[in-house]
């Protein structure tokens, strides 16, 4: 999808405020919902994914199962709200051995397991809004001893609220981020005016 796109800085794949936030995503919903709501904490539109079973309610990108993202930027950043329920997400990458590997992080697992094609790991979320930063290059090297080439697919499962999902060439400090990539809490906004 993005293979022939010049990639530097930031590449956003989901922005909850956009006119069609799920334009390049496919939705799967069973016993749950995926909808845009206004989050009280940030007074802004967010995407809520809720379901009784994390494995049956999710969004996946790209929408076409035969396509891949082709994103070479090594950092995946997600701005996610902790709903104090089970939550998991998965990223599929391609390494320099031409092998597709999956990384699955979840808040209900306690140990990391590395198998040939999937690495599952625990993730701890703070209360409220979190910025999850995932160094795909580092994880690929540490789990498999290979080099990260590109991201093929991202899948975000219930239960969470999403503000933005993007890739970047490196980790940026809060001051370096473009305004629309920051998560402003209303209290911070008032202090800055």
Curated annotation (Swiss-Prot):
User: What keyword terms does UniProt attach to this protein?
Assistant: Cell projection, Cilium, Cytoplasm, Cytoskeleton, Microtubule, Nucleus
Predominant subcellular localization, coarse grouping = nucleus
Q: Enumerate the Gene Ontology biological process terms.
A: cilium assembly; positive regulation of cell motility; positive regulation of feeding behavior; protein polyglutamylation; regulation of cilium beat frequency involved in ciliary motility
Is Chloroplast tagged as a keyword? no
InterPro entries named among the record's database cross-references: CFA20/CFAP20DC, CFA20_dom
Gene Ontology annotations for the cellular component aspect, listed alphabetically: axonemal microtubule; centriole; ciliary basal body; cilium; motile cilium; nucleus
> Record's Pfam families?
CFA20_dom (PF05018)
Give the subcellular location. Nucleus; Cytoplasm, Cytoskeleton, Microtubule organizing center, Centrosome, Centriole; Cytoplasm, Cytoskeleton, Cilium basal body; Cytoplasm, Cytoskeleton, Cilium axoneme
The task this protein performs is described as: Cilium- and flagellum-specific protein that plays a role in axonemal structure organization and motility. Microtubule inner protein (MIP) part of the dynein-decorated doublet microtubules (DMTs) in cilia axoneme, which is required for motile cilia beating. Involved in the regulation of the size and morphology of cilia. Required for axonemal microtubules polyglutamylation.
Tell me which family the UniProt entry assigns to this protein: Belongs to the CFAP20 family.
Q: What is this protein called?
A: Cilia- and flagella-associated protein 20
Query: What lineage does UniProt assign to this protein's organism?
Result: Eukaryota, Metazoa, Chordata, Craniata, Vertebrata
Gene behind this protein? CFAP20
